Amino acid sequence: MPSENFKADQGMLFCFAKEEIKVFWMPDTRFNLDIFFLGSDLTVLDIERNLPFYRGFANPQKIPRTRPIKAQHVLEMRADSPLAKKITKGMKLIWLHSKDLNQTISNAHLSQ
């Protein structure tokens, strides 16, 4: 999704098969990000708030990154999102989609 279409009430959920150390960065954004590191049950394990934006892909070494954090899933939201500001460490997020999250993740990893 182009970053200019990324609304304050939206997020991007990155799902992984196992919990391990993650470092996130988002080149070519036009707004700062709040990045939520989640356990397998979607409990917020850690948060990186207000990660600075970086336009383009030039000079990858200059693109801001999170510190290394152990997590299974990662949620990115705009740092200026009122919803993101309400999410705190220890909070458990709830998956509301009609398909089970674990089954969705399993199917996605099988198709890769």
Which residue stretches match the model-derived regions?
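Compact, glycine-rich, soluble single-domain proteins
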Residues: 1-112
